[in-house]
Structure formats: structure tokens, C-alpha cells
Amino acid sequence: MMFRDQVGILASWFKGWNECEQTVALLSLLKRVTRTQARFLQLCLEHSLADCNDIHLLESEANSAAIVSQWQQESKEKVVSLLLSHLPLLQPGNTEAKSEYMRLLQKVLAYSIESNAFIEESRQLLSYALIHPATTLEDRNALALWLSHLEERLASGFRTRPEPSYHSRQGSDEWGGPAELAPGEAGPGWQDKPPRENGHVPFHPSSSVPPAINSIGSNANTGLPCQIHPSPLKRSMSLIPTSPQAPGEWPSPEELGARAAFTTPDHAPLSPQSSVASSGSEQTEEQGSSRNTFQEDGSGMKDVPSWLKSLRLHKYAALFSQMSYEEMMTLTEQHLESQNVTKGARHKIALSIQKLRERQSVLKSLEKDVLEGGNLWNALQELQQIIITPIKAYSVLQATPTAKDEGRGEPLLPGAEPPLTHPGSDKGTEAKDPPAAENYPPPPAPAPSDSSEPAPAPVADGDIPSQFTRVMGKVCTQLLVSRPDEENITSYLQLIEKCLTHEAFTETQKKRLLSWKQQVLKLLRTFPRKAALDMQSYRQQKGWAFGSNSLPIAGSVGMGVARRTQRQFPMPPRALPPGRMGLLSPSGIGGVSPRHALTSPSLGGQGRQNLWFANPGGSNSMPSQSRSSVQRTHSLPVHSSPQAILMFPPDCPVPGPDLEINPTLESLCLSMTEHALGDGTDKTSTI
């Protein structure tokens, strides 16, 4: 897309906003320019406004405290219009005029909250006041309190509709005017412009709001220098439904945080046009008193902002920040429609949530595909896409009753809190008797003869970390037995680093991933770069680049034929199909002795590529004295191929048919076979 096209799109959005939204958006953008750019823009603006006498006259009126104080004699509609047109022109340092503005603004806000009139105008006035350089920290704290109260009242069921004709507000805090407003005059646009359907500034502050107002501390109730304090509001008969609190009470921060997250008023649609937030990193939650699951440990929601940003849906972070992980996973288009999310956005969100539900089936397809020799680069790219999605630590309470009751003395302990919240307290229970699903894969059993442990159980539904770890084991096996690829190894190591810092993975899973990392790093050191041939000549075109930001749907990764045509490493034809070798059987080796599988003449030199049951796991994969050892054999002919060249260091000659197997290759084969021998008792098989 050309630059002029991008500018055109931005201009079309800009035209769809009202003047207040345009101002806030421009200020947000100006915060990102350099001082030179800012000065240049200032010169341009001063030059263009030099001959505008009208704006100079308007600015003079806006900074006259005497003129502003006389506005209280005007009608309510005119006062609101005057405030909107003059408040942006207030000069910083003019404390006298500012006090008059704040005093008048208090009355407008009090009237708007009680009578449900001028709601849109009140939003805009608050937005101007909160970002205005003339307001102080105390001013913004008090204004933020008004903002919270306005939002609280609206969330309780108010609607921005014209008031009934019989409504007439009378009270001690009524601000004067020669005539009451007619019903049709309740909310006209300012400067003779009709109100826009989505023309408002969101309640939550964006980055354009000074940081001081983003946290309402202990001085939240501090009055302004001009002694502005929220006045008690009298209950009006037109307020249906009414607010739960008493008419003269302000809601406490606890009450604000306890409100339901899904009672957003229908006048505040969460559309891109109505939001001035420009990135997921900006402040999207309500003022500090409300719930924010993005910051809760073990919530599984910490990665939601970055995930939404990758989908270009970061403007809806405020909606997700009020949800739990389970609520997010059950979102539907109907619910999003009730929150007034635009049609296109809610359809995209619903599709993205559906793909989150399909992650486990995608991972299972990936596991099968890697076993069948699929394109390793594509599998790594899919794993990269999955790891950036929101993933919650699996709780044992999510497992089936069979899994929960499987020989554990304390079935509720791991599920009482997120597994990684207090990892130190769980280490002992994991080492003694780990749950099969939660802590996959556990440490290997001490001896293969121990038949007291059950066979490796399938990963429980919803246990994304375990399923992800399982696929990572398959990929590690593939890396160990195939020609080394620097890009694949780098991508794999990046994935492991993300997993090691992710709260959803258990300590046992992280230890396993760390051992695989060490194994791959050892492999990288074993094969010097200069010993490898030109990798680009062997790597076929990687044409399956991720152009979209969403995950592939389930089933799209199981196309073995398409994958095998894009294989980036040479695979010799198999002497026996995988099914006959029993590599995909539940026991892992299908009844065929690993020793026989290694020494069988029928496999020949081609069978070596099919040893998918390697245990890439660190020290646990090394030969031990308690296990049967595999003797050296001469039944595997060695071919002088690029694969063979890469498998040996430069100082070790390539063996011929009559030589012993190189110790490096032998060590790898021993590691694979030792894992296969212990597969029945060690539930860490990567098959």
C-alpha cells in the first residue's frame, strides 16, 4: 500500500470523528513527534492562523473570567455549547478563568448525571479538561472522580435518549437559566453540528490523557483550588432503572470494581471510530478501582493485549480486561452484539476465539504431521503463532474424574491455585506423584522393570501447555535426527525461551524444555558451520509464510502430502512404512524390539531416518547402568552423503562400510534406544 493510500485511509477515519475526538487523536499523535517536528507544526499553525481574527476574538473571550462567570445566566443548552467552544482556548496559567470553568463544569456534570441530558457533551467536556495543559493534578483527580461517577451511573442502566416531556428538574443545585429545555433540546451537537452516532470519547483514558489522571490515589477526593466538590444528587422520577446507591452517596472504589463487566451502556459502542486508543499498550482499563484480568497472576489473560494487537483488534482490550479466561473462551457474536461491538469486529473476534478453541486439535495435527516427516519450518511457524495466544495454566480441576482420582493423596492441591503461582510448594508433590495431565512430561521412571505406573495417558482436553510441550518434543527429535538447519534451530530455541518465561507451563515442563534446549545447543556445537554444505541449495522454497495474524484452523496442518512436498531436508525412502514398524502404536514401539529395530538388516541404511522415538531430553536420555545397553553393529551401511558429512566433525574421518560407527552417531542412537526401552514406564515419550 502506497503512502498516499495510507494517508487517505487515515483521513477518511478522521472525517468520521467529531471535533473532540479529532483533537484527542491529534494530541495523541503529536506526542510521538520529535521537537523539531513539533516546532515545525507550530510554525505552520501560527502562520495559518495569523489572519484569523475570529479565533483571536474567541480566545480573548475564553480567557476572560468575567465573561465566563456571566454564562451562568444563559440557558443550559447555550452554556454547554459555550463551554465546548471556549474551554479548548483557555490559556495555561490563567487560574482565575480556569476556576470559573471548573465551577461551571461541575454544574453541567451534576445536571447531566442526574437528568441524563447532555451526556455526549459531558463526555467531550471531560475529555478536553483532562488533557488540557491548564488543569493541574488536583483538577484532574477531581475530574476523574466525576468521570467514574458518570460512567457508574450510565452502566447502571441509563440510556442517552431524550427525557420524557413531563420531566422538569427542580432542586437546590439547579443552575440558572431563563427557560427550561424542551425534550428535543436535550443533546444537540455543539457549533451547530448534529450529534454523531458514535461521536464520543471512551470512558477509559487513552495515552493522550496525562499520566497523572490514570491513577486516582489517596488524594482522589481532594478538592480543586476553586473548591469544587461533587454535590449530592437528588433522585429524579425519570431515572429508570435507578442506581443502587442512595441519592446523596458517591460510589466507593470497591463498589465501582464490583460492577458487572458486561453492563456496558448501548450509547458507547466499542467501535474503532469511537475509540481514541492507538495501541494495545495504552491505558485501556477503567480508573484503578475496576477489575483488570490482564494484571492478575495465573489468569491466562496477560498475553491478551499483544494477541489482540497482532489481530488488529487492540481497540477492544478494555472489553477483554474485564473478562476471565473462561468467559473469553465462551464469547459469541450474540454477546458481542449486546456490547455494541461493530459487526465486522465482532465477527473477527468470534472467529479468533473459535481458533483459540481449536488450538489443541491443531497441536495434535502438528504432532502427527511432524512424525510423518512434514515440513519442520512450517510446524515451527505454527507453534510461534500459538505461543503468542492467551494460554492458561492447566488446573487439575479441569481434568476428568479419572485423571483427578488417579492415585493422588491430595487431589485438590494443584488445582487450588495456578500451578506456577507458588512453584516451590508444588515441587514435592510433583516429584512424588505428579498428575498425568498437568505435569506432562514427568521425570523418567528409575527402572524399566517397574510396571506399577500406568501407560502414558493422552493429554486432557484444555491442557494446552502439555500438548504444546508434547509437540516440542517431537520437533526436538526431528532436529536431532535430521540435517541441521540454522533457521529451524533458532526458531526452536526462541520457542523454548518463550515457554520458559510463560506462567502457563509447569516447573516439570520447563525442566523438560530446558533439557531439550541443552540438547539442541549441543547439537549445534557438534556440527560446525563450515562443515555444512550450502543450506540454501538443499532447503526448498518456504512458501507457506504466515501472512495472516490468525491461527490455522484445525485440519489445515494435517495435510501430509502438501507438507512433504515442501520438506526442507532430504528424506530417503523408507524400507518399511511407519505403520509396519509400529512407530505410531500406543506403546511407542509397536511390539518391535528397539534393539531389533536398530540391527534388522531389512532396514538397511534407509531405516536410520525413521527412528522417531528418540528422547531428546538432557541427562535423562543418556545410557544408565540399570538399563540394557545396545551393542555396536555392522549391519548399518554408511553412505557418503551430505547427511553423513554433517554427522561427523572435520577431525574424524567419515567411516567406510568396514569401520566402526562414529561415537557421535552411536551416542545419538544409544540415546534414542534407551528412551525406547524405558517408554513403558517413562511417560515422557515424544511419540
UniProtKB/Swiss-Prot annotation:
InterPro entries: PHAT_dom_sf, SAM, SAM/pointed_sf, SMAUG/VTS1_RNA-bind, Smaug_SAM. Keywords: Cytoplasm, Methylation, Nucleus, Phosphoprotein, Repressor, Transcription, Transcription regulation. The modification Asymmetric dimethylarginine is found at residue 595. Its main location: cytoplasm. Residues 160-301, 402-464, 600-636 are annotated as: Disordered. GO terms for biological process: cerebellar neuron development; regulation of mRNA stability. Pfam families: SAM_1. PANTHER family: PROTEIN SMAUG HOMOLOG 2, STERILE ALPHA MOTIF DOMAIN CONTAINING PROTEIN 4-RELATED. CDD domains: SAM_Smaug. It comes from the Eukaryota. This is Protein Smaug homolog 2. One of its GO terms (molecular function) is mRNA binding. The gene is Samd4b.
